[in-house]
């Protein structure tokens, strides 16, 4: 398959031209169903809507049709990182400090290859997690094979998109919707 770093260099300017930040570029599916996955987001909202996905997909397709950087047939998938998003950039650790993450390591650290915990701190070289029953664990970023946010009520609340189009009134903590929910009336 094609070199991810080289593909990222081609995709990044297309995302930037639309005001988007790349979150991840990856190949999945193997030879039977090769898929180039591109995750991007708006830096101000950390989200991506359908129009953004369509625009970025068209720009990438046009660029790849011109340069043909991938020899074999593949499927292009452009999406938002989602709520339980991967943590792929140094800035992600600071942006999501205080939220829970699952970190999988390339090699064991203190006899473990996976840690689930709250993101406590990051310094660009490592991340510190508050891990239940272990306390704080500091993991060098270079040892992380993959990491993602863990879906929690706090994460759902923090990332819920709120469209008020056509809404007359916003009622928070509506009793028939449950505590912490927002009901739009209009």
From Swiss-Prot:
It holds the Pfam family RimP_N. One of its GO terms (biological process) is translation. The keyword Cytoplasm applies. Keywords: Cytoplasm, Ribosome biogenesis. It comes from the Bacteria. InterPro entries: Ribosome_maturation_RimP (IPR003728), RimP_C (IPR028998), RimP_C_sf (IPR036847), RimP_N (IPR028989), RimP_N_sf (IPR035956). Coiled coil: none annotated. One of its GO terms (cellular component) is cytosol. The keyword DNA-binding does not apply. It is found in: Cytoplasm. Belongs to the RimP family. Required for maturation of 30S ribosomal subunits. This is Ribosome maturation factor RimP. It comes from Rhizorhabdus wittichii (strain DSM 6014 / CCUG 31198 / JCM 15750 / NBRC 105917 / EY 4224 / RW1).
């Amino acid at each position: 398959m094609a070199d991810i770093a080289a593909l990222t260099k081609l995709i990044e300017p297309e995302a930037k031209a639309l005001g988007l930040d790349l979150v991840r570029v990856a190949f999945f599916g193997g030879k039977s169903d090769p898929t180039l996955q591109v995750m991007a987001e708006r830096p101000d909202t950390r989200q991506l809507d359908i129009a953004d996905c369509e625009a970025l997909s068209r720009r990438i397709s046009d660029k790849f049709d011109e340069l043909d950087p991938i020899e074999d047939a593949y499927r292009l998938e452009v999406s938002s990182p989602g709520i339980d998003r991967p943590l792929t950039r140094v800035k992600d650790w600071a942006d999501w400090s205080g939220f829970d993450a699952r970190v999988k390591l390339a090699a064991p650290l203190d006899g473990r290859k996976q840690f689930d915990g709250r993101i406590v701190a990051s310094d660009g070289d490592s991340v510190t997690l508050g891990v239940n029953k272990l306390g704080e664990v500091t993991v060098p970023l270079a040892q992380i094979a993959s990491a993602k946010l863990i879906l929690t009520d706090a994460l759902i609340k923090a990332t819920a998109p709120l469209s008020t189009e056509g809404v007359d009134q916003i009622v928070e903590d509506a009793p028939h919707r449950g505590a912490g929910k927002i009901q739009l009336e209009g």
